[in-house]
A protein has these predicted regions:
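Active-site glycine- and acidic-residue-rich loops that bind
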Residues: 122-136, 163-166
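Glycoside hydrolase catalytic-domain groove-lining segments
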Residues: 106, 136-166
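Substrate-binding cleft and catalytic face of glycoside hydrolase catalytic domains
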Residues: 1-127, 159
Length: 166
């Protein structure tokens, strides 16, 4: 199985793709702009293109696990969102997730699409707690697209990171 993680970095010419509240250079990765129709259409076209090129049932070495973002609840460390509330951040992410899901499933009905969460389940050290974020994401998904089968890519690091005695 091949997995692919989709991340949005900074490019001065493409800042319209970044969520308006997150347009600050120098962050690791950025929250996608789902408030602007041109940005949404750009992501929709991009997702369709890459899923056609890299996914699909007809390829032996195809991408079958698609991950949108990295530890999206840690929106100060990874998917920078610029101070969005948990609900706004999760809903914005869910809208982007739905675009990717539709593109992926259009080329491969067996492929899986994942939300990526960090190890901070109850405390949001770098943004929002994983549980609260996932609850908001799930509520939006079930309200707007209950047929979508989504998956969780959970990063179970020790907390704190430097204390890994199990």
């Amino acid at each position: 199985n091949v997995s692919l993680n989709l991340l949005l970095g900074w490019d001065n010419e493409l800042t319209y793709l970044i969520a308006p509240s997150a347009r600050v250079p120098g962050k690791s990765y950025y929250s996608l702009n789902m408030t602007d129709s041109y940005a949404r259409e750009t992501f929709e076209a991009l997702f369709c293109y890459i899923t056609e090129k890299l996914g699909g049932n007809g390829y032996k070495h195809r991408v079958c696990n698609w991950v949108l973002g990295n530890e999206v609840n840690a929106c100060n460390a990874w998917n920078y969102a610029g101070g969005m509330s948990t609900r706004d951040c999760a809903y914005n992410y869910a809208k982007a997730f739905q675009l990717l899901y539709q593109a992926v499933r259009g080329t491969d009905e067996n492929a899986r699409v994942f939300i990526s969460l960090d190890h901070s389940w109850t405390v949001g050290q770098d943004g929002h707690s994983g549980k609260e974020y996932l609850d908001e994401f799930a509520a939006y998904m079930y309200a707007t697209a209950p047929y979508m089968r989504w998956n969780v890519d959970y990063h179970p690091y020790s907390n704190p990171l430097y204390k890994n005695d199990f």
